Amino acid sequence: MVKILKFYSPICGPCKVLEKNLKDSKIEYVDINIFEDACHDGLGTTDYLVEHYNIRAVPTLIKIDESGEELNRHVGILNVEQLKEFANGTND
């Protein structure tokens, strides 16, 4: 099962735009989950993920396979159509 990880900060302007676009995109693929994880949850899990996936800026979307291997990455804002392309694997 493919997942999309979204790394963001609640005070990041571009992150808020991306969040709205994600909601508007209504990606309807059952094999793609949107996983949200604020970059500072205080539990250590987020720190591991930020380091593991080498997150250097937000917002960052990473599509991973079931083993956690990165398939695709995008840093910055995507519009609704671009998000659908990213989810379908046509946006590199």
Q: Which positions does each model-derived feature cover?
A:
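Local sequence-structure signature of Cys/Sec-based thiol-disulfide redox active-site neighborhoods
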Residues: M1-E28
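Thioredoxin-like thiol-disulfide oxidoreductase module
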Residues: I32-A57, S67, E85-T90
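Short, flexible active-site loop motifs that bind/organize anionic cofactors or intermediates
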Residues: Y8, H40, R73
